[in-house]
Curated annotation (Swiss-Prot):
GO terms for molecular function: IMP cyclohydrolase activity; phosphoribosylaminoimidazolecarboxamide formyltransferase activity. This is Bifunctional purine biosynthesis protein PurH. Its EC number is 2.1.2.3, 3.5.4.10. SUPFAM superfamilies: Cytidine deaminase-like, Methylglyoxal synthase-like. It comes from Pectobacterium carotovorum subsp. carotovorum (strain PC1). Disulfide bonds: none annotated. GO terms for cellular component: cytosol.
Length: 529
């Protein structure tokens, strides 16, 4: 359907004023009459544009500190009026048709994100007139265009020029969908905010309010369709948050390679989130969502070489993440040595990209830099429901550790313990990590019993000829029995870091003392399922 509608009159009322003057100038230069409200009208007038205040157009002043501006029949009649049906009644009441509505809403999300936000602040930033105009224009998209995103301004002007002052139905329909998505997201934010202030269970006032809203509304934007999901018979797509405050796989830019698969994205996320844990130059290699090798070094090349040594077999077809710019030397080392699915780093040098270009199927992503880890929510889908928890940003430093054995760890053992503790947080439970000199030497992941994860970590180290004697071992959760300590001692582990908290802690500590192992309690668990 190519039905065009000429753009002769525009109503502009925006909270985010980025680009609005330029857009209004472009409309005005094309003969479009401008209506506006409040601060937007003043901004346009100050820019030298001929603009009519809505209050002058309606003959009704803005009132109640701006709460009532556009809620008037001459405004909504002009937006909702059907051009082929309501012309007579519009003329009878001197209602002029409004062809394009440009609105974005009060900054509710930014307001409630402030530390000192009060309930009154939140209430005053609930937009009423804005969403009403947006929904009115979107409903009447057959005749009216609604614009809620400044990123659409230039494309709209281009289409007006290409279509002799008109917009097509297809464009108006697409803009209407964006508008409904916009108001849905806005109302969801408001519902989530106020829902967290009342008892969470409908009608059950005796239950504690908790930290989560009683109704959860989520809004995500589709970034891409996938060829298939985790398996080829499953359909899939990748959705991202609208406002992302931390560099992540969702913010990443793909510089080369085939389209990312569902599994690529999941594994890249696992690798990137792990490498963010380190301040020093670090490399993480991931396979099937588990780290197969992690190391820090004097450079990312050094870190990569050491991470690769942990498990060269599993590194084949893996995901490699760095926390520094990908440089030429490191790119060359990877490309000449192994098959890799994805390389992700904060940035990549031009020289590095020339190297990776020789392997066009290799996906190279840049995430941008991250300053800090941002609190958020993690979700796990279960049949018929959704589990929600705070993102696991728990960390410990040396001052928070408790040595519970007769022997104190050496400085080297303590460094190794803290290193492998960071890694264990990103290994599927039951997780055991062996490490020495800032390098993993064996990882046991995802076993149903902790002792078998410990045995597997030792087997992996032995298979690669890596010396375990004198190494540290991290466990993501407590040891329910002493057998895990016995298995570690058998291969030469001399320091263990774990949360503690088992009813058999005394037996586990006694086993460590028998073997001369230093044991550290963190009092923090890092299950990962």
């Amino acid at each position: 359907m190519q039905q065009r509608r000429p753009i002769r009159r525009a109503l502009l009322s925006v909270s985010d004023k980025a680009g609005i003057v330029e857009f209004a100038q472009a409309l005005s230069h094309r003969g479009v009459e401008l209506l506006s409200t409040g601060g937007t009208a003043r901004l346009l007038a100050d820019a030298g544009l001929a603009v009519t205040e809505v209050s002058d157009y309606t003959g009704f002043p803005e009132m109640m500190d701006g709460r009532v501006k556009t809620l008037h029949p001459k405004v909504h009649g002009g937006i909702l009026g059907r051009r082929d049906q309501d012309d007579a009644i519009m003329a009878q009441h001197d209602i002029k048709p409004i062809d394009i509505v440009v609105v974005n809403l009060y900054p509710f999300a930014q307001t409630v994100a402030r530390e000192n936000c009060t309930l009154e602040d939140a209430v005053e930033n609930i937009d009423i007139g804005g969403p009403t105009m947006v929904r009115s224009a979107a409903k009447n998209h057959k005749d009216v265009a609604i614009v809620v995103k400044s990123s659409d301004y230039s494309a709209i002007i281009n289409e007006i020029d290409a279509n002799e002052g008109s917009l097509t139905y297809e464009t108006r329909f697409d803009l209407a969908i964006k508008a409904f998505e916009h108001t849905a997201a806005y109302d969801s934010m408001i519902a989530n905010y106020f829902g967290a202030l009342v008892p969470p269970y409908h009608g059950e006032t005796d239950k504690p309010s908790g930290n989560f809203p009683r109704t959860l509304n989520l809004n995500y934007i589709k970034k891409q369709d996938m060829r298939y999901g985790e398996n080829s018979h499953q359909q899939a797509a990748f959705y991202i948050e609208e406002n992302i405050h931390e560099a992540s796989v969702a913010t990443s830019t793909q510089l080369q390679g085939k389209a990312l698969s569902y599994n690529n994205i999941a594994d890249t996320d696992a690798a990137l989130e792990c490498v963010k844990e380190f301040a020093e130059p670090a490399c993480v290699i991931v396979k099937h969502a588990n780290p197969s090798g992690v190391a820090i070094g004097g450079s990312i090349l050094d870190a990569y070489e050491r991470a690769y040594k942990t498990d060269p077999t599993s590194a084949f077809g893996g995901i490699i993440a760095f926390n520094r710019e990908l440089d030429e030397e490191t790119a060359q080392a990877i490309i000449s040595r192994q098959f890799v699915e994805v390389i992700i780093a904060p940035s990549a040098s031009e020289a590095a990209l020339k190297v990776t270009a020789a392997k066009q199927n290799v996906r190279v992503l840049t995430s941008g830099n991250w300053q800090q880890r941002v609190p958020g929510l993690d979700f796990k889908r279960v049949n018929g429901g959704l589990l929600i928890q705070d993102r696991d940003l728990g960390m410990v430093d040396a001052s928070q550790l408790r040595v519970v054995t007769e022997r104190q760890p050496s400085e080297q053992e303590l460094r190794d313990a803290l290193f492998c503790w960071k890694v264990a947080k990103f290994v599927k439970s039951n997780a055991i990590v062996y490490a020495r000199d800032n390098m993993t030497i064996g990882i046991g992941a995802g076993q149903m019993s902790r002792v078998y994860s410990a045995k597997i970590a030792g087997i992996k180290a032995g298979d690669e000829g890596l010396e375990v004697k004198g190494s540290a071992m991290a466990s993501d959760a407590f040891f329910p029995f002493r057998d895990g300590i016995d298995a570690a001692a058998a291969v030469g582990i001399t320091c263990v870091i774990q949360p503690g908290g088992s009813i058999r802690d005394d037996e586990v500590i006694a086993a460590a003392n028998e073997h001369g192992i230093a044991m550290i309690f963190t009092d923090m668990r890092h299950f990962r399922h």
